[in-house]
C-alpha cells in the first residue's frame, strides 16, 4: 500500500460528505447518502441543510449504514451575531435529528473587536447540543479573518466556549481551507492542551487525494500519528470523494457538488 493509498483510505473515513447548495433536493441528498457508502468503507458523516435530515436518516437506515452520522449547519453561512437566532436554528437542527451541528462563529463581530458575542453564541449552542448529546463544530471562516492573530483568537474563544471541533470555513467565501490556516488552528488545539477533547475540520477547497494527504501530514506532525481519527478530524468536502476513490482503485466516483 503506497503512502497516498494509506492517506486516501484514512481521509475517506474522515469525510463529512457535503452538499450545501441552494438547489439541493431530496433526490440529491438521497444520492449523497448512497455515495457515502463506498466499496472501501463509509464516510464519517454526511453534511446537509437541516430540512433534509429526515430523508437522509431514512436513506442511511435503509441502505444499512445507520452509523454514518448526520451533520448540519446553523447561523450559516453569514455568521451573524444574533445569539437568539443562532440558538433557535441549532435547537431546530437538533429537533430534526442532527448528530452534529456546524455553527458559524460571528467572525465579523470579532474583526470589529467584539470577542464576547462569539463566546456567548458558541456557549449557548454548546449547551443546547450537550443536552441532546450532539457534537458541536464551530466554523470560524479563516478566509475572511485572514490574519493569524484573528484565526488564533477565534479558535481559542470557540474552544473556551465548548466547541467539540473547530472548522475552517463555510465553503461559501472566496478563500476557504488552506494548509496555513489548518496549521494555526491545530497549533491552538495543541497549545491549549485540548487535543483529547477538541477536533479539527478543514472545509472547502480540499479537492484531491494529494490535498488530503497534505492536511493529514500537518495533523500528524503537530498532534501525533494516531490523533486524526473520526472523533478528532473531519474533511468537509464533496468533490474530494471521487479523487480518493480513484487513488484507492475505484475510479468514476461522481461527486455531489464542488464543495
Curated annotation (Swiss-Prot):
Q: Which GO cellular component does the record give, naming just one?
A: cytoplasm
Keyword Hydrolase assigned to the entry: answer is: no
- Which reaction equation describes what this protein catalyses? 2-deoxy-D-ribose 5-phosphate = D-glyceraldehyde 3-phosphate + acetaldehyde
Subcellular location(s) of the protein: Cytoplasm
> What Pfam families would the database entry show?
DeoC
Give the CDD domains listed for this entry.
Answer: DeoC
- Per the Swiss-Prot or TrEMBL record, the active site comprises 102 (proton donor/acceptor), 167 (schiff-base intermediate with acetaldehyde), 201 (proton donor/acceptor)
Does Cytoplasm appear among the keywords?
yes
- GO MF entry, a single one: deoxyribose-phosphate aldolase activity
Identify the EC number(s).
4.1.2.4
State which pathway it belongs to.
Carbohydrate degradation; 2-deoxy-D-ribose 1-phosphate degradation; D-glyceraldehyde 3-phosphate and acetaldehyde from 2-deoxy-alpha-D-ribose 1-phosphate: step 2/2
* Biological processes annotated in GO: 2-deoxyribose 1-phosphate catabolic process; carbohydrate catabolic process; deoxyribonucleotide catabolic process
- Record's SUPFAM superfamilies? Aldolase (SSF51569)
Q: Which UniProt keywords apply?
A: Cytoplasm, Lyase, Schiff base
Checking InterPro entries in the record gives: Aldolase_TIM, DeoC, DeoC/FbaB/LacD_aldolase, DeoC_typeII
Family assignment?
A: Belongs to the DeoC/FbaB aldolase family. DeoC type 2 subfamily.
Q: What does the protein in this record do?
A: Catalyzes a reversible aldol reaction between acetaldehyde and D-glyceraldehyde 3-phosphate to generate 2-deoxy-D-ribose 5-phosphate.
Q: What is the designated name of this protein?
A: Deoxyribose-phosphate aldolase
Task: Name the source organism.
Answer: Cronobacter sakazakii (strain ATCC BAA-894) (Enterobacter sakazakii)
Protein encoded by which gene: deoC
Amino acid at each position: 500500500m503506497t503512502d497516498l493509498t494509506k492517506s486516501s483510505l484514512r481521509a475517506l473515513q474522515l469525510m463529512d460528505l457535503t452538499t450545501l447548495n441552494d438547489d439541493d433536493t431530496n433526490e440529491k441528498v438521497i444520492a449523497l447518502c448512497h455515495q457515502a457508502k463506498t466499496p472501501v468503507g463509509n464516510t464519517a458523516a454526511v453534511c446537509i441543510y437541516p430540512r433534509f435530515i429526515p430523508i437522509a436518516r431514512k436513506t442511511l437506515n435503509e441502505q444499512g449504514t445507520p452509523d454514518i452520522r448526520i451533520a448540519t449547519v446553523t447561523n450559516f453561512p453569514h455568521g451573524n451575531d444574533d445569539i437568539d437566532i443562532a440558538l433557535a436554528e441549532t435547537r431546530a437542527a437538533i429537533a430534526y435529528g442532527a448528530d452534529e451541528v456546524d455553527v458559524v462563529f460571528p467572525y465579523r463581530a470579532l474583526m470589529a473587536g467584539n470577542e464576547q458575542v462569539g463566546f456567548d453564541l458558541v456557549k449557548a449552542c454548546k449547551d443546547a447540543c450537550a443536552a441532546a448529546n450532539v457534537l458541536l463544530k464551530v466554523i470560524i471562516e479563516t478566509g475572511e479573518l485572514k490574519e493569524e492573530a484573528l484565526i488564533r483568537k477565534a479558535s481559542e474563544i470557540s474552544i473556551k466556549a465548548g466547541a467539540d471541533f473547530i472548522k475552517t470555513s463555510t465553503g461559501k467565501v472566496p478563500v476557504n481551507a488552506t494548509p496555513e490556516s489548518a496549521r494555526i488552528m491545530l497549533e491552538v488545539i495543541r497549545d491549549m492542551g485540548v487535543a483529547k477533547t477538541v477536533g479539527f475540520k478543514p472545509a472547502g477547497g480540499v479537492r484531491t487525494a494529494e490535498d488530503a494527504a497534505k492536511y493529514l501530514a500537518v495533523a500528524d506532525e503537530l498532534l501525533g500519528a494516531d490523533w486524526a481519527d473520526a472523533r478528532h478530524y473531519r474533511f468537509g468536502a464533496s468533490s474530494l470523494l471521487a479523487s480518493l476513490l480513484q487513488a484507492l482503485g475505484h475510479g468514476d466516483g461522481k461527486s455531489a457538488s464542488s464543495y
